From Swiss-Prot:
List of residues that carry Phosphotyrosine: Y329, Y339
Keywords: Cell adhesion, Glycoprotein, Membrane, Phosphoprotein, Signal, Transmembrane, Transmembrane helix
Post-translational modification remark: Highly glycosylated.
Record-given protein name: Hematopoietic progenitor cell antigen CD34
Gene name tied to this protein: CD34
Amino acid sequence: MLVRRGARAGPRMPRGWTALCLLSLLPSGFMSLDNNGTATPELPTQGTFSNVSTNVSYQETTTPSTLGSTSLHPVSQHGNEATTNITETTVKFTSTSVITSVYGNTNSSVQSQTSVISTVFTTPANVSTPETTLKPSLSPGNVSDLSTTSTSLATSPTKPYTSSSPILSDIKAEIKCSGIREVKLTQGICLEQNKTSSCAEFKKDRGEGLARVLCGEEQADADAGAQVCSLLLAQSEVRPQCLLLVLANRTEISSKLQLMKKHQSDLKKLGILDFTEQDVASHQSYSQKTLIALVTSGALLAVLGITGYFLMNRRSWSPTGERLGEDPYYTENGGGQGYSSGPGTSPEAQGKASVNRGAQENGTGQATSRNGHSARQHVVADTEL
């Protein structure tokens, strides 16, 4: 029986002795045997401290490794918890690192160590949180390769938060109040108010809100400070509740009308009930003196026109005011009554008429005697006939 047991134990004995020989051949600096026969790695520890970046500063120590190589992990010197202050743009980040070591016993193998680092950041609402990525690389530990677990920490840079919405305080608007008679432009938008107020009062109370509605989107598209929004307001003389927004051209008027329709609820909060495109001239009132002057000028022009019309129709009048072809007898006898020789006329009247005709034919206008000779001598002309 003893021989059989020795024969059976014979093949097993070299395997046990081989394992003991291999363990005894290991360097004393890396491995040591305890009383139970379990191999325990002796881990050298080296501590170093360095600054990672210009804006982020924290302390670093090394994690022990069985091969003598060190890997950097952000831990503290005094315990498992560390507080790290990261200063960038006057914002403080609080980082807490906790290291948990897990040991596992395996037969004929080296204990593997795994470090888990958890980082907690406390940040304000408007500041972006830096992203922390843990990249573990795990490999089983055994006698042949003598490797341990290492964990690397990667931190992304912090970017400041930028809001895309336009800041209302950066809107630069200039509102001018002008008289309706001083405006040289012809087109505008009538802002119908819920109550009568002057241009100065509207500018003081609700001018900022109107500039926010009409100039907010324009300055959001343009660069900051590159353009100043200018608005020209004029008080209507015909309708006191209408405040005219005078614009340069029809293209600008159409764009403003579309913008007002889009923000109609905001305009109602400002007391603007309605808005329509109207002419500037229709809101100018004329004074009483102007009306009197216009009526007087029209009356004088009418009188002069009527007088000229009648003067042009009277062709018998010369420019000097004398009638053409007149003689004293024609005037005395009612305009040519002496020329007619009716049956009831006397012979003396017929004789006078013939005398007058003879005088007109001679062109002298002087009465001739009955014997054919005139009482006055004829004037001889200077030139020969």
